[in-house]
From Swiss-Prot:
One Pfam family matching this protein: ATP-synt_DE_N
Recorded name of the encoding gene: atpC
Membrane topology term: Peripheral membrane protein
Function (record text): Produces ATP from ADP in the presence of a proton gradient across the membrane.
Protein name: ATP synthase epsilon chain
Length: 138
């Protein structure tokens, strides 16, 4: 199939997905993007969000919390800090991720009191993490 690309989703713990897909919706740090066959070469960082693949075998959804994606004309590789199939995410999992983001914000405020950049980044991470829960209806 000329309309498919090789897709790989890897987290530090395991390979979550590998196969041919027609499209991948990626929660990029600069906004959501859809990558398909013949996409221009791109590397983007991920924000917490829902990564969705579409392919011959149907649609798959994964919650990711960060990392990066490398996109070429023939492949899409996502290296995620944390990735969990959406169907496996529990409220307790999400609550733990939000708590971790809240703690990171507190630490950023303490360490960078007069530097808004790192504090803003941590606040955005927390907001994105909360939005993930709203998006997947936990």
């Amino acid at each position: 199939m000329a309309d498919t690309v090789q897709f790989d989703l890897v987290s530090p713990e395991r390979l979550l997905a590998s196969g041919q897909v027609t499209a991948v919706q990626i929660p990029g740090a600069d906004g959501d993007m859809t990558a398909m066959a013949e996409h221009a070469p791109t590397i983007t960082t991920l924000r917490p969000g829902l990564l969705v693949t579409e392919g011959p075998d149907g649609t798959s959804e994964y919650v990711v919390t960060g990392g990066f994606a490398e996109i070429t004309a023939s492949s899409i590789s996502v290296l995620a800090e944390r990735a969990i199939p959406k169907a496996e995410v529990t409220k307790a999992d999400h609550d733990a991720m939000v708590k971790e983001a809240e703690e990171a914000l507190v630490k950023a405020k303490e360490a960078f009191a007069n530097e808004p950049g790192p504090v803003d980044d941590a606040a955005k991470m927390l907001a994105d993490m909360v939005a993930v829960g709203d998006h997947i209806t936990l």
